[in-house]
Amino acid sequence: MATELQCPDSMPCHNQQVNSASTPSPEQLRPGDPILDHAGGNRASRAKVTLLTGHTHCSLPAELDAGACVGSSLNSESNSGSGDSSSYDAPAGNSFLGDCELSRQIGAQLKLLPMNDQIRELQTIIRDKTASRGDFMFSADRLIRLVVEEGLNQLPYKECMVTTPTGYKYEGVKFEKGNCGVSIMRSGEAMEQGLRDCCRSIRIGKILIQSDEETQRAKVYYAKFPPDIYRRKVLLMYPILSTGNTVIEAVKVLIEHGVQPSVIILLSLFSTPHGAKSIIQEFPEITILTTEVHPVAPTHFGQKYFGTD
């Protein structure tokens, strides 16, 4: 299950329980104190400074200041938000969600896949400037599949009864009908196959949004949806959330077609704190599912995936 980001008002944002024998007890810590964590699989050889925000452990890269990503322009903000910028970013460290206030503002609408070494390796290859296109696409497709499967887990199911080959009655569940996918062209199309691999008959719509050359604002050039999309739950696919402007325009188009924000689940691979915050502020009922929140997003994704870098 994805991790919901919460920061209850009834308790301090920091000083949650830590699974480390060498870590001081919560009573000995003050809000904001760093905790040295020397445990953890392949990362045992390097201590990492961890800030505990709500129920999520957010590790801060050494080269970034703890307040750098909140209320300030990001390195990727110069892009249009289309996720197709040709510039490469420096390989990122662990996820960073900003301060407690950001977590309060975003809340449970932002869900993170549980971090493990497999996901971190895929993220590393995608961010690696020297990775071959073959390795990049292979890793991207694997990460997309993980995000899509967790996205399907957010959809409604209903109980059902089936009969096994031996005549045994088995109580299980099945999807409730009425789901569809919508990809934001062009980088969102990279996620379509991952969705079809999990749902062979699902209908997929498309939106093309680009920045206007004069105003630099996102502009809708094309939109094609299932005719009854207003009755469906929507998996909106866009791998990189930088400014959030492109997604905001896409959601506005969906609303114009009768879709309620509460039935939209945004599937992405990487998000900046600014992008996630902007979307949730505009549409508080939308759900965002991603693998990482970090000030620097790999905005070269679309160009490298489709071989136009």
UniProtKB/Swiss-Prot annotation:
Residues involved in uracil binding: 299-301
Ranges where the record places region Disordered: 1-41
Principal location listed in the UniProt entry: cytoplasm
Keywords annotated in UniProt: Cytoplasm, GTP-binding, Nucleotide-binding, Nucleus, Phosphoprotein
Keyword Transmembrane helix assigned: no
Cellular component annotations (GO), alphabetically ordered: cytoplasm; nucleus
Biased composition (Polar residues): 13-26
Pfam families associated with the record: UPRTase
Subcellular location(s) of the protein: Cytoplasm; Nucleus
Stated name of the protein: Uracil phosphoribosyltransferase homolog
Organism: Macaca fascicularis
Lineage, opening ranks: Eukaryota, Metazoa, Chordata, Craniata, Vertebrata
Gene for this chain: UPRT
